[in-house]
Amino acid sequence: MKYLLAGLCFSVLLLSCSKEEVEPDFTGNKNREQGIFKVLTGDSVMEMNGDIVTATLTHFNDITAAFPTVRRINMLECPGSDDDETNVKIGRIVYSKNMHIHINDNGFAASGAVDFFLAGTKRTKGSNTNLGVHSWEDGNGTEGKDLPMNHPDHDLFLDYYVSIGMNSSDASDFYFFTLNAAPSSSIHWMTATEITQYNMLTN
């Protein structure tokens, strides 16, 4: 998971508009391909390939409004998220839509993309796939794993996991596993045992 700084430098703030002005949640774009998403022939399956960024929320809302029959997302190569707050917003929408998320053969989800994957009410994967986790870092050298377990900076993720169907105990177990699995500068590819232990896939 990538953790973004809460504050930006003053000069950037002077030039910035509100999130709603810069990246509206919905624009009405009806294209089959928007950002990291592409609706396939038949309109029931959408591919996802790339990093989740701030604009991804708009792309997701637009493309699912234009193609409301999309029920499955096939993840290809998804390295993570550059905006964790946006990522959890999209994940909650995915969960509310009762979507199936599948990692394609030879594909992977890492970092924040694993959090996205967990939003699927049905979660499957093909062959030769990987799920990668690690700690986050706040930009000043502080790793999430180095903070006390009751630190409020953990709440974004813990609250998210509960909102997509985990009980609080499972949410805590998985989250702190990811923090201790690898530092933010590295990645831990989950073993088959870990994938089973943390219920990454649905039956």
What are these regions (language model features)?
Residues D25-H59:
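STAS-typified acidic loop motif
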Residues Y3-A6, S11-Q34:
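Bacterial Sec-dependent N-terminal signal peptides
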Residues Y95-D138:
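Glycine-rich beta-to-alpha active-site loop
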Residues D51-T58, S81-V88, G107-S111, K125, ...:
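Soluble non-cytosolic domains of exported or imported proteins
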Residues T56, T64-P68, E77, V94, ...:
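Sec/Tat-exported extracytoplasmic proteins
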Residues R72, S96, N140-N203:
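Charged, glycine-interspersed solvent-exposed loop segments at helix/strand-loop junctions
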Residues P68-T86, H100-N106:
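Short, glycine-/small-residue-enriched flexible loop/hinge segments at domain edges that mediate gating
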Residues L57-T64, N87-G91, Y95, V114, ...:
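Extracytoplasmic/secreted envelope proteins and their assembly/folding machinery
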